Regions:
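A substrate-engagement module of RecA-like helicase motors
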Residues: 130-193, 199-203
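N-terminal accessory nucleic-acid engagement/regulatory domains that precede
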Residues: 1-58
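Conserved Walker A/P-loop ATP-binding site and its immediately adjacent core
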Residues: 111-134, 145-151, 261-265, 347
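Conserved pre-motif I regulatory segment
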Residues: 51-86
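C-terminal helicase lobe and adjacent C-terminal extensions/tails of nucleic-acid helicase motors
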Residues: 266, 318-398, 419, 423-508
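Walker A/P-loop
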Residues: 79-101, 232-233, 258
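Conserved interdomain linker/interface between the two RecA-like ATPase lobes of SF2 helicase motors
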Residues: 276-350
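Post-DEXD/H (motif II) to motif III coupling segment of the RecA-like Helicase ATP-binding lobe
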Residues: 217-223, 230-299
Length: 508
């Protein structure tokens, strides 16, 4: 990988790397090569040094103070290794990971960061946060986005334009940019200072594809951060394990983030780093592994997550689709001012329900907005949907009236959304908890009457066949166990459920 990158730079026609009729010994003696190489590395966006670590508070808003796992970040070893952060949704894992990565950059253990996420929507949302981080940590940095539709991402194209634009003095006008050379190929995504990508871009480094060694070289020199590490299937976890083994072999570092990680998956990830944990693990926790037994840091009592109850009900319906009564309840909730999310497992079901809701609202001669968000849109339309979803249901949304969104799994993870009531089709317990992380996510003084506490309605099938749902999730046993727990409780109590429920469902 290193040799390929050197060859690409050395053979580029944009620079004249030698003076005609100059002896090779004189060429090196005059330091011409060193100067030219430095210019090329800067021009191509490969060279930038992070500023000294200034503390996690620099990454937080001025009114915020470190909380939860964040207070333990500065106690993590600044040595190459695997760090695993387990903490509830919305508890600041991302800032904790970025702060720890900054500490490793400051110690010279790495010179860049790669942030991998499960979906294009979450990668797009992370790009803006990466820009803010880059300004604080690098000052002048190249931020690269990599997924199959990045050419349609307006924010990334703006970074590319900033990289191409020059002032009259030949300096970049923007401190955050993406050099054209880096943007020309997704193979170079990990060669800038910060790479934001979907996780498949990382996994390609261990698959038999062209120039995989270039991706590997970029990863090995970076701090690799993988978000929502619980969200991948067995095949992807196998590939991720190989990525971690190679990262360890070259003395690299990795940070894994999850709110809902089964013990078996945690053990496999630690084993990939030739390390091990304990079965009866605390929660939340930060693990650091080099080799042998991983060290585990718990969160001080005063910073532990507050007890949080989500009121639940489980309804058995034909094909788990809302009937007339449930549709009426959804509309009534929105009329009372609630922001309601309905999460379907199939795009066709989401479209069908949205049509049904709009038809019923029209018949009642009332005005309620019904939004739809899924992965089947043209990408340019999907971007608009992402922005609208965050605008209407995010932290800074104006909540002057009720609203309904019918969505699929695209709102399940990493998006900063806040709902008063959620209805969701049956899904594995860890993914259910991710969905519940969008309920009452932010502190608000006033919630609509009847929704002062977070509420979730799980829609399940009438029989135990689960139909297409078992094909989506591939494990009927997990769905059945999840439903069994829901049927026996009228509420889920966090953070204890992150361990208790998940281990009961995923018991060996």
């Amino acid at each position: 990988g290193f040799c390929s990158v050197c060859d690409w730079i050395g053979s580029n026609t944009e620079f004249a790397y030698q003076t005609p009729d100059t002896a090779l010994a004189d060429y090196f003696a005059a330091s011409v090569a060193k100067v030219q190489a430095g210019n090329a590395l800067h021009r191509f966006g490969l060279l930038a040094k992070a500023v000294s670590y200034k503390g996690l508070s620099v990454l937080l808003n001025s009114k915020e103070s470190p909380r939860g796992v964040q207070v333990r970040v500065d106690g993590l070893p600044t040595t190459p290794g695997l760090t695993l952060i387990e903490a509830p949704t919305g508890s600041g894992k991302t800032e904790a990971a970025l702060a720890n990565a900054w500490r490793l950059l400051d110690q010279g253990i790495a010179d860049s960061i790669v942030f991998a996420l499960p979906t294009q929507a979450t990668a797009n949302a992370m790009l803006a946060r990466a820009e803010e981080f880059a300004v604080k940590v690098f000052g002048d940095a190249n931020v690269v986005l990599a997924h199959g539709k990045r050419a349609f991402n307006a924010s990334f194209q703006r970074l590319v334009e900033c990289g191409q634009r020059k002032t009259s003095q030949g300096k970049e006008e923007a401190s955050v940019q993406c050099a054209a050379w880096l943007a020309n190929s997704r193979k170079r995504v990990f060669l800038g200072q910060i790479g934001v990508c979907t996780v498949d871009q990382v996994l390609l480094s261990v698959l038999p594809v062209r120039h995989k060694f270039v991706r590997g070289f970029g990863l090995n020199k970076s701090v690799l951060i993988v978000d929502e590490v619980h969200a991948y299937d067995a095949y992807m976890h196998g590939l991720l394990g190989e990525v971690l083994r190679r990262q360890k072999a070259v003395g690299g570092s990795a940070i894994l983030l999850s709110a809902t990680l089964p013990a078996g998956v945690r053990a496999k990830l630690l084993a990939a780093w030739e390390s091990s944990g304990v079965d009866d693990a605390p929660y939340p926790a930060l693990w650091h592994a080099t080799q042998g037994a991983a060290s585990c840091m718990t969160v001080p009592d005063e910073h532990r997550p507050e007890r949080r109850e989500v009121m639940t009900e489980c309804l058995k319906l034909p094909d788990a689709f809302p009937n007339d009564e449930v549709v009426g309840r959804i509309i009534a909730a929105a009329e009372s001012g609630a922001r309601v999310a309905v999460v379907m497992n199939l795009v066709d079901d989401a479209q069908r329900l949205a049509r049904l809701l709009r038809h019923e609202i029209t018949d009642r001669k009332i005005t309620i907005d019904v939004d739809v968000f899924h992965a089947r849109y043209r990408f340019i339309d999907r971007q608009a949907k992402e922005k609208a979803t965050i605008a209407y249901y995010g932290r800074n949304a104006v909540r002057d009236k009720g609203r309904i969104i019918v969505a699929t799994q695209v709102i399940e993870q990493s998006l900063d959304l806040d709902f008063d009531w959620m209805l969701t089709k049956i899904c594995p317990v860890d993914l259910l908890f991710q969905r519940l992380g969008r309920l009452h996510r932010h502190q608000r003084e006033h919630r609509p009457a009847g929704f002062e506490l977070p509420r979730c309605t799980v829609l399940s099938v009438e029989d135990e066949d689960y139909g297409l749902h078992k094909l989506i999730y591939g494990n009927t046993r997990v769905l059945w166990r999840t439903e069994l727990l829901l049927a026996g409780a009228d509420r889920i109590v966090f953070p204890g459920a992150y361990r208790d429920w998940i281990e009961q469902v995923y018991q060996r």
